[in-house]
Structure formats: structure tokens, C-alpha cells
Design a protein with these regions (language model features):
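A Zn2+-metalloprotease active-site environment signal
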Residues: 1-260
Length: 260
């Protein structure tokens, strides 16, 4: 068992853009992105999902999302990561009272209308979208799958890591994301949350949004939470810790900010 885990760890490691962190990578984009895209389409086509296609808010989500995507794609290409990412970006607004947003592997983004009163401004919306996109760019879900496979260290898991990918990978993705298009938001460790904050701040700065405005968004989120974070933040750092970390990261992000 131990030898299998060591062999798999040596078999595939990757580096997170910008942060330079090494991570276990037994699941490729070619494996996880199509499954994520299918889950995204299933969710959006579900009769209970109310996708907003018209109006100012829907246009804002798509506009800011596309600005982030252009900036991110340019950064990845210019820094030697272009061949590792082939994201087919999509940005949709979902009508819901839920205070939520997420980005699935491959760049499939959803913003729930319930979070818009908290974002308030374009910079606020860029903050939360940049953060969720940060999880995807850092391959946090693929890393979680890889860690599950390493723990299992069985024939099926090794097979998925070395090419027999369809059934096992789909099953593991189902475990993380739920079955039948019902998205179960991934719960990341605090280290992953901090990494997504760092990436998100930089991405919003690259897209022309002042990363200093992220502090205001998280302060509004703290007031919204009233001590009880929404489900998608349930394993995130405390509000005070996150805001302090963001303030510490702002000088780095400002290096990429040129304004609009």
C-alpha cells in the first residue's frame, strides 16, 4: 500500500500557477473537465434551476467573467502554462436567494443572485468570481480527487491514474460533486482557501479591478454572515482571518493592477 502511494506521488506532480505550490496530480484536465462540463449542463438544464439570460445582472456576470478569463488566459500563456489549460469558459447567473458562487473544473462558473446584494459593485463581483476561479486554476478539485485515489491505492484508482479513466474518474467526481447534477460545493482546507484568495486577488487586478476593494466585499460578507457563514463558506477561514490575509496579499496583487 505504502509503495503504491509513493509510486503514484512520484508519477504525477504539478505546480500551481503564480503560487508555485507543488501538488499531487493523478487526474488530468482531459479526465475531469468533460465530466464537470456534463454536470454543469445537467444543472443548468434542470427545471428547478432558474438561469437568468437577460437583464443588467446577467450581463454583468458575463462581462466581468469574460474580462477575468481573458486576463487569466493571457497570464497562463505568457508564463508557460498555456498548454496545460484549455478552459472553455462559461458564466451564468442563477436566480436564487442562496448566497453562493462557484467555478467547476474547466471554467464553468455560476453566480447566484442572492450574492449580488453583497457584492454590490463590479469589483465586489470580480472578487468572488476571481476567488472561485482561483480554485479551478489551482486544480483544487483534481487535487482532492488525486488524494482520494492515493488513499484508495487500489487497482481501480491506479488504473484511472494511468489511463483507464472513464468509470473510476466519473465515480470519484460524482462523490465530490453529487449525483444527477445536484452540485455539492467542495469544501476546501484553509490552505486552499488562502491560495484561492491569493489567485483571485491577482486575477481581478489583471482584469482591471482594484484588489483593495476585496476587503470591502469580505467585510460586507462578514456582516451578512452575522457569525454564521453560508454553506459555501462553512470551511473557509474566519472573517477576521480572511480579511487580515487579504490585506497582507494586496501589495502583491497591486503589482498587476493598472486600472481601467
Amino acid at each position: 500500500m505504502a509503495l503504491a502511494v509513493i509510486a503514484m506521488a512520484a508519477y504525477a506532480c504539478s505546480t500551481v500557477p503564480l503560487t508555485g505550490r507543488s501538488q499531487l496530480s493523478l487526474v488530468s484536465d482531459d479526465q475531469i473537465n468533460p465530466a464537470a462540463a456534463q454536470s454543469y449542463r445537467t444543472l443548468l438544464s434542470d427545471p428547478s434551476t432558474k438561469v437568468v439570460n437577460t437583464g443588467t445582472d446577467a450581463q454583468r456576470v458575463k462581462r466581468i467573467g469574460n474580462q477575468l478569463a481573458v486576463a487569466i488566459d493571457s497570464y497562463l500563456k505568457n508564463n508557460g502554462y498555456g498548454s496545460q489549460y484549455n478552459y472553455q469558459w462559461e458564466f451564468n447567473l442563477i436566480q436564487s436567494k442562496e448566497v453562493n458562487a462557484w467555478c467547476m473544473p474547466g471554467g464553468k462558473v455560476a453566480v447566484y443572485s442572492g450574492i449580488l446584494p453583497v457584492t454590490q459593485t463590479d469589483a465586489g463581483l470580480a472578487t468572488v468570481m476571481g476567488h472561485e476561479i482561483g480554485h479551478a486554476i489551482a486544480h483544487h478539485s483534481a487535487e482532492a480527487l488525486s488524494q482520494q485515489m492515493a488513499v484508495q491505492a487500489g487497482g481501480a484508482a491506479v488504473g484511472a491514474a494511468t489511463g483507464n479513466k472513464s468509470q473510476t474518474t466519473q465515480a470519484l467526481i460524482g462523490t465530490l460533486y453529487g449525483v444527477g447534477g445536484q452540485l455539492a460545493t467542495l469544501k476546501y482546507s484553509r490552505d486552499k482557501e488562502n491560495e484561492a484568495d491569493r489567485l483571485g486577488l491577482t486575477f481581478m487586478a489583471m482584469a482591471g479591478y482594484d484588489p483593495r476593494q476585496a476587503v470591502s466585499f469580505w467585510q460586507r460578507m462578514a456582516a451578512q454572515n452575522q457569525g454564521a457563514p453560508p454553506e459555501f463558506l462553512s470551511t473557509h477561514p474566519s472573517d477576521a482571518t480572511r480579511i487580515a490575509n487579504i490585506q497582507r496579499l494586496i501589495p502583491e496583487a497591486m503589482k498587476y493592477y493598472k486600472g481601467k
